[in-house]
Amino acid sequence: MQDELFETEKIPPKNTKNAKNAPKKSFEEHVHSLEQAIDRLNDPNLSLKDGMDLYKTAMQELFLAQKLLENAYLEHEKLQTPDKKA
């Protein structure tokens, strides 16, 4: 389980050409990774360095999950708004 969390994709810098080629995770996958990170952060034997690395990874997962949720909300709003051109 520990190794699985660190296999998540890092957010590439915005200028990286490979950003579009990186596999995308679903909202549920991001939430699952975040839940795993929270479980690990509760481990009293976790070192400070590992805890900080895990926290950074968890924050990335949270950010990406929030973006997916925001995009879904915007898409829902778009579908609910009648097209004025029609």
From Swiss-Prot:
Disulfide bonding pattern of the chain: none
Keyword Hydrolase listed: yes
Any one cellular-component term (Gene Ontology): cytoplasm
Main location: cytoplasm
SUPFAM superfamilies in alphabetical order: XseB-like
Pfam families hit by this protein: Exonuc_VII_S
Region (Disordered) residue spans: 1-27
Keywords: Cytoplasm, Exonuclease, Hydrolase, Nuclease
Keyword hit for Cytoplasm: yes
Protein family (similarity comment): Belongs to the XseB family.
Function according to Swiss-Prot or TrEMBL: Bidirectionally degrades single-stranded DNA into large acid-insoluble oligonucleotides, which are then degraded further into small acid-soluble oligonucleotides.
Protein name per Swiss-Prot or TrEMBL: Exodeoxyribonuclease 7 small subunit
